[in-house]
Amino acid sequence: MSKSHPRWRLAKKILTWLFFIAVIVLLVVYAKKVDWEEAWKVIRDYNRVALLSAVGLVVVSYLIYGCYDLLARFYCGHKLAKRQVMLVSFICYAFNLTLSTWVGGIGMRYRLYSRLGLPGSTITRIFSLSITTNWLGYILLAGTIFTAGVVELPDHWYVDQTTLRILGIGLLMIIAVYLWFCAFAKHRHMTIKGQKLVLPSWKFALAQMLISSVNWMVMGAIIWLLLGQSVNYFFVLGVLLVSSIAGVIVHIPAGIGVLEAVFIALLAGEHTSKGSIIAALLAYRVLYYFIPLLLALICYLLLESQAKKLRAKNEAAM
């Protein structure tokens, strides 16, 4: 069926509206799970220096995440303006954190990049490279921290210290294998479900790891600041890495409950009080999830309203 066929246009409109409705429903469901009064009270009463420092790091983290899509721009060779790429990346990341990868990482990217004139094959490569970049940094940091034994696990937890070290070594081996293939593989092209992917150079792979690792470290620094710097920074970072993989396994939007459960299990008592942890993580959610999501929603609506004009401008420039 031709894309100009009336049935195709109708189907596209229906799918678009279904997507909008799904996003709205997810936002409403998520909003009902949040104690907004408590969230506002925590932010209002927080130490101003720690809060402003954390806000600055949130901005830095979102800018770094935007570099994932800028790397993908270089990798794919598309010509969208860098500011458009950064804006799409910001919107997608905010929705991804709160409403899951399917909505933010995939759905939003396909919606916005296609509206700006990119073909589906290019968008698939952008998403693939972005998610690879994110997890390469995670794997490198988690491998290093788990192997070094920075995270002290409580007795009778789900895994013991030895298992965590073995996991860390395994993660570092994944990094080594990826770098080896990027540096020495002769067959550098692969096709997955009709999409052609090209293995990047080893220098590009190092850039992926560096940018993503810095982003994960900034995220850890935000929580560390909000905890009042009362716990070793690398311990806090390690706990964040453990909670992140737990959130992926449980697959709850925004990891509601998972983040708190892991932090309380690994930090409460000897290191800091349970109340301090809950307050810090609630402030973290407000600064890193809620406020960016509200801004992303506004940016999304503005981008949708300007999409046709921007697409025409992009197609004229290509």
Predicted segment positions?
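Predominantly cytoplasmic-facing regulatory/coupling regions of multi-pass membrane proteins
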Residues: 1-90, 147-248, 274, 279-281, ...
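Membrane-interface alpha-helices at helix entry/exit sites of multi-pass transporters
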Residues: 83-87, 101, 106, 116-132, ...
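Membrane-embedded alpha-helical segments of transport systems
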Residues: 91, 95-99, 122-143, 246, ...
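Transmembrane alpha-helix interface/packing and boundary motifs in multi-pass membrane proteins
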Residues: 92-100, 241-260
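Re-entrant/interfacial helical elements at transmembrane boundaries that shape
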Residues: 103-115, 144, 253-268, 282
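Internal, well-ordered alpha-helical segments in soluble enzyme and binding-protein domains
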Residues: 109, 119, 128-135, 139, ...
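Interfacial segments of multi-pass membrane proteins
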Residues: 112-122, 239, 243, 261-276
